[in-house]
Amino acid sequence: MSNKAWGGRFEVQPEEWVDDFNASITFDQTLINQDIEGSIAHATMLANQGIISQQDSEQIIQGLKSIQHDYHQDQIQFSASLEDIHLNIEHELIKRIGDAGGKLHTGRSRNDQVATDMHLYTKKQVQDIIALIKSLQSVIVDIASNNVDTIMPGYTHLQRAQPISFAHHIMTYFWMLQRDQQRFEDSLKRIDINPLGAAALSGTTYPIDRHETTALLNFGSLYENSLDAVSDRDYIIETLHNISLTMVHLSRFAEEIIFWSTDEAKFITLSDAFSTGSSIMPQKKNPDMAELIRGKVGRTTGHLMSMLMTLKGLPLAYNKDMQEDKEGLFDAVHTIKGSLRIFEGMIQTMTINKERLNQTVKEDFSNATELADYLVTKNIPFRTAHEIVGKIVLECIQQGHYLLDVPLATYQQHHSSIDADIYDYLQPENCLKRRQSYGSTGQSSVKQQLDVAKQLLSQ
């Protein structure tokens, strides 16, 4: 007799190396808890519907729980010849409780079984990711709250542009993560759907109750079409997309952390606990954690592209290609959860070099726009003011000084309306104070922004 659940129709058994190629047990045992949870719900429903006896159902449930316990105690070895987590568990169950174990699969296919497992797994992981995002956001808000008055150069094209609040800069990532969190939250509506009971593709002749298993498994709804239930992998693609975009945001933040920690910038100092050294250069302190996060974006995005390509030509309903949905998702989940934890610890322990930042904006031309705006207050058209300031900046560059160092007489040679109040006007802290538009870098606006962020985190 064949050891395959489908062996009755076959005359020749596959060789071991073919089994190894076909099997998914090396990675889909990640789903053991979800598989057993789904099977317990299915067995409970089968008994309640009179499809199997209560005694058989109780035996099945106790057997499943013992398998789960023993697995987590490293007391079970699964076999590639049994292909996957579903058949390995069923084989072990029958071995433990006898024929009653063979009744578990009544009214069910591996097609709806694996779909149920993946929905349960993805739902739990997305909920975990949301919690990790919120935790990182909370740290960002704490850092920002302590740095409302810390001034730094804002950049465009990686060239110094205008002075901004460090709090305003770092809060940008709060809002990126807020959108990421919202996307994950919204996706739960499409993840939290029960496919169990769809069977292979067309439903089942047994009088099952899909609403009961939906309630037992805490799903928000159930699939209305059995064919769709076993064919749908949209929720996996959506999750991979949301993971990839969140990783892109972490990567952008990581790039800035890397730049800020250079000797050239010295805006921050990373903790030794989140840095590494060199095997040849004794002086080195490298931002490896930030670099790894930046590098892992290619990994998660690759999984997204792989899944899109896997599905693009598949006919309905289940095809073995769908086995490829798991490793990429498992790895992407592991990657983003690790990256979020590392990022939180990395920025929570970094030192912000406030004096260095505040001094930096006095040694550049990031207040040049302020000078142009000053001229506008003297009824000079902005385009004319822009031209005047450009010439002043060029002269400063040629003479090796900055706008705060320009003698008043020199200013007045460029335009007679410039008065002695220009020096106070160009001070970086005053540049920020004048930024009062909603969402701007001014202190009062940043404090308002922080209040909104704290309110969101408390929800």
Curated annotation (Swiss-Prot):
GO cellular component, one term: cytosol
Subcellular location: Cytoplasm
SUPFAM superfamilies assigned to the protein according to its UniProt record, in alphabetical order: L-aspartase-like
GO biological process terms, semicolon-separated: arginine biosynthetic process via ornithine; L-arginine biosynthetic process
Alphabetized UniProt keyword annotations: Amino-acid biosynthesis, Arginine biosynthesis, Cytoplasm, Lyase
GO-annotated molecular function: argininosuccinate lyase activity
Enzyme Commission code: 4.3.2.1
Pathway linked to the protein: Amino-acid biosynthesis; L-arginine biosynthesis; L-arginine from L-ornithine and carbamoyl phosphate: step 3/3
Record's catalysed reaction(s): 2-(N(omega)-L-arginino)succinate = fumarate + L-arginine
HAMAP family associated with the record: Arg_succ_lyase
Family: Belongs to the lyase 1 family. Argininosuccinate lyase subfamily.
Name by which UniProt lists this protein: Argininosuccinate lyase
Gene behind this protein: argH
